[in-house]
């Protein structure tokens, strides 16, 4: 069996993090050198997952992060607290891997819900197991969910995820809706071969069920580094596939820093009206308005999904650092954020960590 290593990027230690932070503002918003303010925190709880989507993970053989390297519940309460006050984070999203595999998920959500000012709290999940936990998560303080679902065709789903769990995901969506975790959003990464067919049925399903579809261009974040730009099913391809079947109009509302370009769908003979979005991270990059900062399951700050460097907050935590030192390191990490991801540059290098070890 071939074992795929997670890969460890260049990590700034405590001394390096402090040096970078000296150039960053010492208070106020969490800024980078280009004037962008990070207000959206993505927190990965685990790198493990119970599906094996080909664009993210190999079928087998992926080395997991050792348990002692993962942040514990107390650390996962403290870091978001620092992020909200004094760093000004207003939205916290818990991700994985698959965050439902984290046994302390409800505890971590409840801690975030106690923060003041209270951030919006959301979850990105594959939906397997969500039906049983949606009500408890809502009670803990979760506001809404995004559920990953690339197709409603059972055979296509099994081929993409290497697991026959479509019914579980559909049940999870329904459970989230029943628990009031709305709007329920569906994240779809389309297969280059079947995606044009899948997206038509997926949008029809979402409109009928009252979910909001988000189609996300496949990015170079797979563990096997098999992504190819010339195989991309881009946003223009998605719209071309949908337009023969639906009446679409651009949403006139200001987009702001949101990653999705939204489209309104007029009611048709067989479908209600609604909206969907396309996140064109590759073909129409939105790096200039990015407002995200990322915390990996092992306590590293990443300023971008495609960063080649990380800043170690776990080391600071476990060395007994105070909140001010952690804040300074975080500010330094974000101050060094690049202008863009560079995917379309000839010298682009794919991150060593796959998406499962970063957090979406």
From Swiss-Prot:
Binding of [4Fe-4S] cluster 2: at which residues? 287, 290, 304
This chain's function reads: Catalyzes the cyclization of GTP to (8S)-3',8-cyclo-7,8-dihydroguanosine 5'-triphosphate.
Concerning PROSITE patterns, the annotation shows:
MOAA_NIFB_PQQE (PS01305), RADICAL_SAM (PS51918)
Domain Radical SAM core per the UniProt entry, residue ranges? 33-251
Q: What is this protein called?
A: GTP 3',8-cyclase
Cofactor dependency: [4Fe-4S] cluster
The UniProt keywords, alphabetically, are: 4Fe-4S, GTP-binding, Iron, Iron-sulfur, Lyase, Metal-binding, Molybdenum cofactor biosynthesis, Nucleotide-binding, S-adenosyl-L-methionine
Molecular function via GO = 4 iron, 4 sulfur cluster binding; cyclic pyranopterin monophosphate synthase activity; GTP 3',8'-cyclase activity; GTP binding; metal ion binding; S-adenosyl-L-methionine binding
UniProt binding sites for S-adenosyl-L-methionine: 55, 97, 148, 219
Q: In which pathway does it act?
A: Cofactor biosynthesis; molybdopterin biosynthesis
* Reaction equations catalysed: GTP + AH2 + S-adenosyl-L-methionine = (8S)-3',8-cyclo-7,8-dihydroguanosine 5'-triphosphate + 5'-deoxyadenosine + L-methionine + A + H(+)
EC annotation from Swiss-Prot or TrEMBL: 4.1.99.22
By sequence similarity, the record places it as follows:
Belongs to the radical SAM superfamily. MoaA family.
State whether keyword Nucleotide-binding applies: yes
State where [4Fe-4S] cluster 1 binds: 49, 53, 56
Q: Note the subunit structure.
A: Monomer and homodimer.
